[in-house]
Each structure stands twice: as structure tokens, then as C-alpha cells.
């Protein structure tokens, strides 16, 4: 709009949890990071970064780990679970990129300083152990490029909720 008429825009992205969906090109940006580091190292790095930024007190420790250690997984399990986390990261990346485009458009139009932005999401990392889709007759539903991996699992969910316990479907800190 070129005038100062108020407007309302509701922009809804699919929440970054099951069913996880992202473009393969975006997934590729994150796969190696998660495959190489695994959840143990990622969790430690996120905790340190939050403490360094003052988001959490450096004295806050980690919640008890309730999952297998990354090094206990087979190579095939590491490949599979790293891919699932990369799909999640790609989905968040896409949302972040496009929200950035919207903000840039508001800046260019001179409307950003007179705009109220609410960013809302659901309540924490999703750990539901949904399985791969399969067995159906509708090929578009059973297409990995469309369905991605329905969930990234409990270990990545607990990593995402660092330093808190559990995940969103529990009445814990996650």
C-alpha cells in the first residue's frame, strides 16, 4: 500500500514439527552439520552459546539425558537421524528466510516502524515418534520429497529444548 491506511496481514507457516517437510536443497545445507556433530555435541554447543549470550545463567546445568549417546548409534542410524534433523532445520531456515523477506519489504515501503509484529509458535520441540509413511496407494502421500520425515525424534527434541527437560507433550520444562 502506498498510503497510510492500516492493514492486517496474517502469515501462517507450518509449525516446524511433524510432518517435517522441506526442499532437498535446503536440507543439504544442514545434513553434514548434524551428521558430523550429533546431538551430544550440538547440545553442549547450544548450552554454551546460550550462557555466553546471557540467555541462561552459566551455572545452569543439563537436564538428565534420556536418550542414547550419539556414538552408540550405528552409521545407518546416524545417517537417518541426521537427515531428519536436517529436514527440521531446513524448515526453520525457510520460515526465517521468508519472514526476513517480509520485514525487508516493510522497510522498503517505509512501514516497518509503524508495524506491530507478533511471532507465535507452539510450545516446544516435538518428540512424537511418528514413523515413515508407507503402504498407502496414494503416491503423493508416500513420496519422501513431499512427506519428508514425519518426526525428528526424542533425542533431537531434547537437544532442541536444551537446557530443559522433556518435550512439549509433557508437563515439564520443555
Stretch-by-stretch model annotation:
Residues 1-174:
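Active-site-proximal cap/lid insertion segments
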